[in-house]
């Protein structure tokens, strides 16, 4: 293989793997707001004490939660971190879980607030209009996802395989 071809392959791999390279430690950057891999990892661990989640799902929720929470606030059904902490305390008590509510991360509380808001949004009469507003706002987000997590398309972080990796038949 020629030296220039090898250099081109290495450069392509570096560019592909370097998504979020300007933000070291980032799982994603959303409209300039960095979501760190440590935030995703911690929220995943904390949420797995309640139910089963994976890092991609957690990252997806952290990307879209601000949009949902903002829309919920506009509808008068916004949820706060304090409400999420109270909800978590109730869940812990009902399920006899030993959680230190004072150390739960803001990311986990944001995801719980997001979930609470979504549940109330489902009860609204005009959910079609709301859904369209949410889709439009989410589509307008400038999202850069670390390739370790995949890519953000259609409001979900999904696994991707770089085109330079050949899949087995």
Indicate where each model-derived feature is located.
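Short, low-structural-confidence N-terminal segments
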Residues: 1-53, 139-169
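Residues at structural and domain junctions
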Residues: 6, 26, 58, 119-120
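Generic N-terminal initiation segments characterized by hydrophobic and/or small/turn-forming residues
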Residues: 8, 12-14, 59, 106-113, ...
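N-terminal targeting/tethering segments
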Residues: 21-110
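A C-terminal, polar beta->alpha supersecondary segment
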Residues: 25, 65, 69, 73-74, ...
